[in-house]
Amino acid sequence: MKKMDYQNVRGTQDYLPEQEVTRRAIRRTLEDTFMAYGCKPLETPILNYTELMASKYAGGAEILQEMYTLTDRGERDLALRYDLTIPFAKVVAMNPAISMPFKRYEIGKVFRDGPIKAGRFREFTQCDVDIVGVASQAAEAELMMMAIDAFDKLNLQINIQYNNRKLLVGLLQLFEVEQEQMNRVILILDKMEKIDQKTMLTELQELGISSNSINKIKQFLEERTQINMAYFNEYANENMLLQQGLQELMELTAYLNTLELSEQCIFNPFLARGLEIYTGTIYEIFLADEIIRSSIGSGGRYDQAIGGLLGSEQSYATVGISFGLDVIYTALELSGKIERNTPIADIYIIPIGTEKAALKLAAELRRKEYKVEVELSGKKVKKAMEKANRENTQKVIVLGEDEVTHNMYKIKEMQSGKEELVAFEF
């Protein structure tokens, strides 16, 4: 018989208990923060129709190339979700009775057949919050504040860079970039931190962008150190879309100043976020210490997606933010901020021929909300105590027949060595 290949699929991994304890603690911290902001939990299917995930309101051509697709026995074209945004938009589209504004969070696995790097896998856990029904920049400000709160609780300091898609598109319109080339140009600009300016300009030439437009883009890039929000005032009267984007940015900045978040939330006029789904504010989250240089979270406003899925022109004011749980874990690990050997059980009971009595005692202790493990494999006391020390268990009970006969047990605090005799009716 051929030996089975026990390796994990490339881009996937197992999380052993020591890792999973930390991952679940991260998840609880995020969930507690999300709920503190009034967000409601939601769960959506991993498996979706390809048509939904590939719609023009979905992830764009670059992500669609990474989509896992399959055909079921009914020959239906299906896909594994690559994010939580489109499944959420589908839920809102299918449930018109949902009360607005609707704030939801979802933490779940998503799949992308993309490149693998630190904290980036092909099966990974995404943590999303989205708000439907708030047109003002108050929604963006609250999500950015929530992100800072969440990462503070995780002992990670972050910066959030933000921009506005309308500002960027309006500027490119003034640079005479053709509408059908717009998103491909934005995708190239989105790679600014990864490629040099010469390579970027070459890619624009290969795309067929006119030399006039390229020269204007080049000048814009060369002035990057001098560009702030006021820079765009002179263009505001020349392009309505740019004007709207600038107004939204000023509104958001006013909120951030009031919330005293302006030091951590930084306007970046070159932030592009190449996904076509975005219609307004966009932002990306970075670690302040740059222990991971790529973004660890992102989001933005996508007012057309829900209406688009419904096949209507109606706009649904929607904005979201997303964090990767796996990259958060990697950041904590690289920063040395993960507590190792966290005990699972509060009390470890070692029976010496008294398994039935040990299970009865454990049941009573659990009713008192202790986490209790009973040694059931027949380990000798010495080996069992070594396990208790190795797993950093706080308290141990060695339960022999004499203790059961006398209706008492001795509980030992492992750190101090202190022992206490406790009566119990076996």
Task: Specify the residue positions occupied by each region the protein language model found.
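Auxiliary tRNA-acceptor-end handling modules of aminoacyl-tRNA synthetases
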Residues: 1-20
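Polyanion/phosphate-binding surface patch
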Residues: 46-78
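Generic N-terminal leader/targeting and pre-domain segments
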Residues: 3, 28-38, 43, 58
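Acidic, His- and aromatic-enriched active-site or binding-groove loops in soluble protein domains
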Residues: 63-72, 177-199, 287
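Acidic carboxylate-rich catalytic motifs and surrounding loops in phosphoryl-/glycosyl-chemistry enzymes
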Residues: 45-46, 161-166, 268
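Positively charged, Gly/Ser-enriched RNA/tRNA-binding surfaces
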Residues: 22-37, 48-49, 65, 75, ...
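Short, conserved phosphate-binding/catalytic loop or strand-edge motifs used
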Residues: 121-127, 162-170
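Hydrophobic mid-domain F-helix/FG-region of cytochrome P450s
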Residues: 148-153, 167-176
